[in-house]
Amino acid sequence: MLTAMLFRPWAGQIIARIGPIKVLRIILLINAMALVLYGFTGLEGYLIARIMQGVCTAFFSMSLQLGIIDALPEKYRSEGVSLYSLFSTIPNLLGPLIAVGIWHVENMSIFAIVMIFIAVTTTLFGYRTTFANTQKEVSPKDEVLPFNAMTVYVQFFKNKALFCSGMIMILSSIVFGAMSTFIPLYTVREGFANAGIFLTIQAITVVIARFYLRKYVPSDGLWHHLFMMIVLTLLMVASVIVAFGPHIVSIFVYISAIFIGITQALVYPTLTTYLSFVLPKIGRNMLLGLFIACADLGISLGGVLMGPISDTVGFKWMYILCALLVTIAMTLSKIRQRQSVSKAS
């Protein structure tokens, strides 16, 4: 994840120069090599494979998302991003089940065969798709950018739309990361609910919400403050419910998992679609890469930052702090609304 986060802005720059189709073809081959490494190497090979997959993740996701943004009409852009997010979530549900099955078989040959199968099928399917659409590809002109892959990080603070959206994404992702990381420990220590059921409900909700609610994600380039407030309120309420989970009926804890799933399904597509409209066209790909890196950063901080906090003040107060972080995100949404109104006037 760290590798992907660092490479995303650079990936956006490369894609802007040579186009998403060519990048996708190269990344499919590198990903196949990384998957094969898993089946035939030890720990050293795993480290190399993980770094390779981090690079692949950065370029692969950027290629697909930028391709979707460029290819779809504006009114369908949010639906395209939502469906991309949906299909990127499904492997996270099926992957652990496959891994557990291979683990119980206790045969590394099966693991190697599965990795090779995934590598071959993804490469063949990806190449078939890109070849079928080659005639639609337009070679992008080289952009003269006012920043590069290193100085682009300064733009996070200079661009008001990017800053507000990025901070909302970071704060929300911190809560998502804290939920998925510490819910198992919290429920076992305090003896309430069931972490497996909670996380399953959350994951299923993400999938269902991204499919059935995709048409409600704004796709007009305007900042919809009321929509963001409703979505973020669900996350804030869920954080408070989880914080007081040991003292309430478990059914409310499971309902909070639904709230978290809905928020997780809607926040990312909403902000990504909005930025695809308002960011300057010159350097847009790099700036979008920087925003997507914010989601990676937030998930990481949810475990790295909130872990020591929970050790110091306990899980209850850590999740109350999560609710306060969401409140800050709601404040940023209000600030962005005022900025949009003043700019329009």
Protein language model regions, located:
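Transmembrane alpha-helices of Major Facilitator/SLC transporters
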Residues: 2-6, 197-218
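Paired small-residue
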Residues: 44-53, 251-259
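Cytoplasmic helix-loop-helix junction between adjacent transmembrane helices
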Residues: 51-87
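Juxtamembrane intracellular "pre-TM" segments in multi-pass secondary transporters
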Residues: 133-165
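Helix-to-loop junctions at the C-terminal end of transmembrane segments
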Residues: 7-19, 210-223, 311
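Conserved MFS/SLC helix-loop-helix module at the cytosolic interface between two early adjacent transmembrane helices
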Residues: 6-38
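C-terminal membrane-cytosol helix-exit motif in multi-pass small-molecule transporters
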Residues: 116-139, 332-336
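Cytoplasmic membrane-interface "Motif A"-like loop-to-helix N-cap segments
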Residues: 17-27, 219-232
